[in-house]
């Protein structure tokens, strides 16, 4: 499902295709280019950081710098998917600061007694982060990268082979309405 956006200057005229560094105006071609560039950057060392909002933005920049000139920068347009609208851009900074402060106050979930507790905490965090939807594109992928870092920081192993993308996406969608059980289950599956 494509995004809904209000007056999006980042798109080519009369399309929903985001302007990009390769000047690709076809969505299917852009999707392929995005994946190729993302996979290429995944082979490189990730930017270091403190698991804070700046680190989250640096990760987005790392993976999307070859695709979008605004990589790593919070979005400036209102956007949503389906009937759900994400955090308005004028509140992204303050909401993200609150969320990442809470994450730090909770010691990045490193005190979780087991995988189930970590998964529940991480599900809450990801659902909130997804509702903020910091970037115009690439949120889900960067959220997974960040989840990998959180998992490792908490002393658990992230097993990408256990990830079920379709089920994870469905769980993210229902988490928007506060239902965290499915997302916690999917997270527990990968750790």
Name what the model sees in each region.
Residues 1-191:
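FIC/Doc superfamily catalytic core
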């Amino acid at each position: 499902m494509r995004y809904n956006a209000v007056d999006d200057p980042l798109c080519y005229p009369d399309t929903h295709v985001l302007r990009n560094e390769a000047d690709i105006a076809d969505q299917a071609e852009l999707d392929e280019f995005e994946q190729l560039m993302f996979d290429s950057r995944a082979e490189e060392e990730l930017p270091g950081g403190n698991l804070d909002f700046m680190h989250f933005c640096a990760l987005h920049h790392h993976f999307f710098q070859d695709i979008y000139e605004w990589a790593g920068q919070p979005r400036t347009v209102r956007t949503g998917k389906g009937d759900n609208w994400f955090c308005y851009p004028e509140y992204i900074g303050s909401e993200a600061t609150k969320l990442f402060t809470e994450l730090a106050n909770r010691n990045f979930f490193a005190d979780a007694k087991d995988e189930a507790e970590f998964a529940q905490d991480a599900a809450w965090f990801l659902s909130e982060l997804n509702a903020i939807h910091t970037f115009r594109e690439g949120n889900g992928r960067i959220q997974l990268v960040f989840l990998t870092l959180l998992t490792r920081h908490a002393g658990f192993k992230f097993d990408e082979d256990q990830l079920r993308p379709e089920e994870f996406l469905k769980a993210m969608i229902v988490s928007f309405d506060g239902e965290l059980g499915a997302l916690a289950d999917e997270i527990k599956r990968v750790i």
